Amino acid sequence: MSNDFISAESLIADPGRVYELVANAAALGPRLPGSAALRRFEEILATGFAASGLTVELLPYTVRSWVAREWSLSLGNGRPDAVVSGYYPESGVTALEGTTAPLVYIGTVEDADVIDDEIRGRLVVVDYPLRQMPLGYPACWGVYDRDQRVVPTEWEHGVKLWVPLEELRGRVASAGGVGLIAVWTGTCDVEVMGLYEPIRPPSAQKLLAETTAEGKRRYRPHPRTELPAVWVGPSGRDELLAAAAAGSEATLKLCADVHEAAPVNSIVATLPGMTEEAIVLVTHTDGVNALQENGGSVLLAMAECLARLPLESRRRTIVFACVTGHMCREVFEVDGKTPTLAECEGLLTQRPGLAAVAVAALGVEHVGSTEWVREGAEMIPSGRNGWAHCLTTSETLADVMLKALEGTDSDPVLVADGPIWSLAYPFSEVGVPSVSYGGLPAYLMAITPDSYLGRISKVRLSAETNALLRAVRALDGIPQIAH
């Protein structure tokens, strides 16, 4: 039985197929939790996997669907309305006419001084700085970049202060504040326009779970604070702080369509091999634009290709898991009342035997990104691809990924020995050798009219998909993979 790498031509008959799938998903609009767009995307994936002969299973959940429809900040007293760059998801809602109250500025999110008498009945303004943050990878397994660029040492999207901001929002609500206005600093309006942040606080699924004394994983209750909040770009800071210093009133409006117990599903599609040993490919279904998240489209394209191979050429079973709940504060059981674990924590909870047969797990997200750089008050394309990050603690997996990338248009990719993030993390925690793969550009979380489809490189998208296919074929032939 041969497990040699398979060429792109052999696996992707139509070079535009992956892009077509991504474009079709982007045309649905933001796939927010519980939205009609997400439900339609789930249908596309389930139907597509089944059409290729895979066994498809749906793991049902419910979520609180919270879709904003109108948001603004009017300063009054002849001042121009503030340019609101976005809203804080699931923060809270105002009446249709908005909430009018005096403004008060309390400093920076990390050291804001919340004094009840100064907060009560006011709209609270706080600075939210965008700072550089070191990557912090312990070691680098290798770099695939034919241009031999300088390897990045900092995260492109900077520090995310989601946790202190959420904690501050709770303190402001407890002190009687009626709204929160977070002002971006250290960036430009264009860079932060439309950002859907935070996707949930805390920002990692692992923080929504805990281990019991019996060694079982369970949901960790997460309190919800109903306090409407919006983001303002840096160009509006001076006017906003001047209004606050003058004790002026402003009107904050944040209206949303809220539906409890909206149905969602994780999709598990299985392509059988000659043995029960499994290679697991994971991504999430919910996302805000063509880049975040296009992993489901990539996995479907991979499944279509791999399903064309004869069974006897597939030693191991391949599991494609497109999980839900990545962008939710809470996910519930189908009763709509009982909080539960979702994403891959939920997958492993509902399918405890999966970890025992999994020989490797590959988390696939944010494929095909291009590089955009800040130039003054604008963001412009550099004409190059953005860096992709491939993280694994396994030297074997690092070697597989570097060889799979070689000779493709996937670069630049940094393959590092670093903490497994996001979807592959739960597999790594239970001892399954894992890889986290994806780009992390600053525009990753933006909702835009064109879904940032134009920031996807068709060439790179196809190349990365092919590299991942090559990696899967290589993993199929390795007898044992060290964690």
Where are these regions (language model features)?
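Second-shell loop/turn segments in exported
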Residues: F5-I12, A26-A36, A101-Y105, P138-C140, ...
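Acidic, glycine-rich active-site loops and adjacent beta-strand->loop/helix elements
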Residues: L130, G186-T187, T285-G287, A321-R329, ...
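Extracellular/luminal Protease-associated
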Residues: V83-Y219
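His/Asp/Glu-rich mid-to-C-terminal helical/loop segments that flank catalytic regions of hydrolases
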Residues: E304, R316-V319, A442-H483
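Soluble metallo-hydrolase cores and metallopeptidase-like ectodomains found primarily
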Residues: S85, P89-D116, Q205-E293, A301-E312
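Noncatalytic luminal/extracellular "stalk/propeptide" segments of secretory-pathway proteins
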Residues: S2-N3, I12-G16, E20-D145
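Metal-dependent peptidase/peptidase-like ectodomains
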Residues: M274-E276, V323-V430, S434
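Zn-dependent metallopeptidase/amidohydrolase metal-coordination segment
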Residues: V413-T465
